[in-house]
């Protein structure tokens, strides 16, 4: 410390003032944060796009962003009813226009009446607009077959991500071996590892079983938990269903087993259910943790703590930019729930347009309303096309030597395993790169296809994967898959 002070004094005498904030003085937890979905691969993709705009010759004419689940960036059209209501809310003068259906006008008027000054530009209360929270509660009741939901247990949020991080902030505590441990699936969505690094929590990995279509195995949960108790205090179990990046849909039997395990081991359950509308595989069905927990009866229904999350960014909506979401808490301590409300109030409120959109998602047009027919047709078209693209992706990858892809049962991604030659692995190590990062960088430079290496999500040692979204339009997806298959064959030959 004394030498650093002397260095600063000497620099000052020389007319130089050192930076207060440097890599050495900044929060070390932030330095440890990594987020592969928007990591180095994506930064290089942005550079390539800029080079193409400047006329630099490349082996491709466009960069295809298959790295992120951003449906509308990939060309998916917004749901008409949602945009009509939003337009009316943003510019209420349109309420007198004959170009908008009456049910859209009624919905917009209801939202505006709940806003301060009847304006979408006003702050809402921190937990979200009350009528929209009531709509969310009614949606959960319908989804779960009549099981009650209390609006007071629902908090609207800036996408599901913000609610997940808020919940982790409440849960992470202690020092040393008493520090909170959080069990997360591997492969995982990097939000979890990034948030845990930022909060200085202990990440506890449990591995999904790739040989059984990414099944969640209770024996593996128990292994991870027992080993973790030597270095931390495991208090939280995170489950992503349907899975990201793995695309599996958990069975009801599996969910029941997870709930029993969490109850027996004293773990708070976090259920990331943002892909609940994205289920494609025959025989697969989404079961909410809230529904299963309640139907299991006491003591689980009355004692097991649960937070479940949903979002407007995924599903058939794909409204990522509006940042709308919610969390529902079950069996949370009443005093802790007050602390949660306090923590959310520091952020003032979630974006009000995102709240409005969440309200539309959970309360879409009904069969008796004029917008229903178009809404239903648009919704079914999106989901049917996603199902077809999921099947095509699995089929093309599994026909390619050296690539193996589990069924894409749900969500928006495939996560194929790729075989990489030893020379390629050695070359990657020489460059200081993970082997699948090296593969993905080479793929990007040669084809313009941007995917995320499996090492950014976590994977079993000695295996290599990449995550690719199934969102591109069907004609572009076919070309993308063929290019990927051809490139892998060429890459394998080059390094054999």
Swiss-Prot record:
<keyword id="KW-0007">Acetylation</keyword>
<dbReference type="InterPro" id="IPR015422">
    <property type="entry name" value="PyrdxlP-dep_Trfase_small"/>
</dbReference>
<keyword id="KW-0808">Transferase</keyword>
<comment type="pathway">
    <text>Amino-acid degradation; L-alanine degradation via transaminase pathway; pyruvate from L-alanine: step 1/1.</text>
</comment>
<comment type="subunit">
    <text>Homodimer.</text>
</comment>
<keyword id="KW-0963">Cytoplasm</keyword>
<dbReference type="GO" id="GO:0042853">
    <property type="term" value="P:L-alanine catabolic process"/>
</dbReference>
<dbReference type="Pfam" id="PF00155">
    <property type="entry name" value="Aminotran_1_2"/>
</dbReference>
<dbReference type="GO" id="GO:0009058">
    <property type="term" value="P:biosynthetic process"/>
</dbReference>
<dbReference type="GO" id="GO:0005615">
    <property type="term" value="C:extracellular space"/>
</dbReference>
<dbReference type="InterPro" id="IPR015424">
    <property type="entry name" value="PyrdxlP-dep_Trfase"/>
</dbReference>
<feature type="modified residue" description="Phosphothreonine">
    <location>
        <position position="22"/>
    </location>
</feature>
<keyword id="KW-0597">Phosphoprotein</keyword>
<dbReference type="GO" id="GO:0030170">
    <property type="term" value="F:pyridoxal phosphate binding"/>
</dbReference>
<keyword id="KW-0032">Aminotransferase</keyword>
<keyword id="KW-0663">Pyridoxal phosphate</keyword>
<feature type="modified residue" description="N-acetylalanine">
    <location>
        <position position="2"/>
    </location>
</feature>
<dbReference type="InterPro" id="IPR045088">
    <property type="entry name" value="ALAT1/2-like"/>
</dbReference>
<dbReference type="GO" id="GO:0005737">
    <property type="term" value="C:cytoplasm"/>
</dbReference>
<dbReference type="InterPro" id="IPR004839">
    <property type="entry name" value="Aminotransferase_I/II_large"/>
</dbReference>
<feature type="modified residue" description="N6-(pyridoxal phosphate)lysine">
    <location>
        <position position="314"/>
    </location>
</feature>
<comment type="similarity">
    <text>Belongs to the class-I pyridoxal-phosphate-dependent aminotransferase family. Alanine aminotransferase subfamily.</text>
</comment>
<comment type="function">
    <text>Catalyzes the reversible transamination between alanine and 2-oxoglutarate to form pyruvate and glutamate. Participates in cellular nitrogen metabolism and also in liver gluconeogenesis starting with precursors transported from skeletal muscles.</text>
</comment>
<dbReference type="GO" id="GO:0004021">
    <property type="term" value="F:L-alanine:2-oxoglutarate aminotransferase activity"/>
</dbReference>
<protein>
    <recommendedName>
        <fullName>Alanine aminotransferase 1</fullName>
        <ecNumber>2.6.1.2</ecNumber>
    </recommendedName>
</protein>
<dbReference type="InterPro" id="IPR015421">
    <property type="entry name" value="PyrdxlP-dep_Trfase_major"/>
</dbReference>
């Amino acid at each position: 410390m004394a030498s650093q002070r002397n260095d600063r004094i000497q620099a000052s005498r020389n007319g130089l003032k050192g930076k207060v904030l440097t890599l050495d003085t900044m929060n070390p937890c932030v330095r440890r944060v990594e987020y592969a979905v928007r990591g180095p691969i994506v930064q290089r993709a942005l550079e390539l796009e800029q080079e193409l705009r400047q006329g630099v010759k490349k082996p491709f004419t466009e960069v295809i962003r298959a790295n992120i689940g951003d449906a509308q960036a990939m060309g998916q059209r917004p749901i008409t009813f949602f945009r009509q209501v939003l337009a009316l809310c943003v510019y209420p003068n349109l309420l007198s226009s004959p170009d908008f259906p009456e049910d859209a006008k009624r919905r917009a008027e209801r939202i505006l009446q709940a806003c301060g000054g009847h304006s979408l530009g006003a702050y809402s209360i921190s937990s979200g607009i009350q009528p929209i929270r009531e709509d969310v509660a009614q949606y959960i009741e319908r989804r779960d077959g009549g099981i009650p939901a209390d609006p007071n247990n629902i908090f609207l949020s800036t996408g599901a991500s913000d609610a997940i991080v808020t919940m982790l902030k409440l849960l992470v505590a202690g020092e040393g071996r008493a520090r909170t441990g959080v069990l997360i699936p591997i492969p995982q969505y990097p939000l979890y590892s990034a948030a845990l690094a930022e909060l200085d929590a202990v990440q506890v990995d449990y591995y999904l079983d790739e040989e059984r279509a990414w099944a969640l195995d209770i024996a593996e949960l128990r292994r991870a938990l027992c080993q973790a108790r030597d270095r931390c205090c495991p208090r939280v179990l995170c489950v992503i269903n349907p899975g990201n990046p793995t695309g599996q849909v958990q069975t009801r039997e599996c969910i029941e087993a997870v709930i029993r395990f969490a109850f027996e081991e004293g773990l708070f359950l976090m259920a990331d259910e943002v892909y609940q509308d994205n289920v494609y595989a025959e025989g697969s069905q989404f079961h909410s943790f809230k529904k299963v927990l309640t139907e299991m009866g006491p003591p689980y229904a009355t004692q097991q703590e649960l937070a479940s999350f949903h979002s407007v960014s995924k599903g058939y909506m794909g409204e990522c930019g509006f940042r709308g979401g919610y969390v529902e808490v079950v069996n949370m301590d009443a005093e802790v729930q007050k602390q949660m409300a306090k923590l959310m109030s520091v952020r003032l409120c979630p974006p009000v347009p995102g709240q409005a959109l969440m309200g539309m998602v959970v309360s879409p047009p009904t069969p008796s309303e004029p917008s229903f027919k178009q809404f239903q047709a648009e919704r079914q078209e999106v989901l049917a096309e996603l199902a077809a693209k999921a099947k095509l992706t699995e089929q093309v990858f599994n026909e390619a030597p050296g690539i193996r892809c589990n069924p894409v049962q749900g969500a928006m991604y495939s996560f194929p395993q790729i075989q990489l030659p030893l020379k390629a692995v050695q070359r990657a190590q020489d460059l200081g790169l993970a082997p699948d990062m090296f593969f993905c960088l080479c793929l990007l430079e040669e084809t313009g296809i941007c995917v995320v290496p499996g090492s950014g999500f976590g994977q079993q040692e000695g295996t290599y994967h990449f995550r690719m979204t199934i969102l591109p339009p069907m004609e572009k997806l076919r070309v993308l898959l063929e290019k990927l298959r051809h490139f892998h064959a060429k890459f394998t030959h080059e390094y054999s």
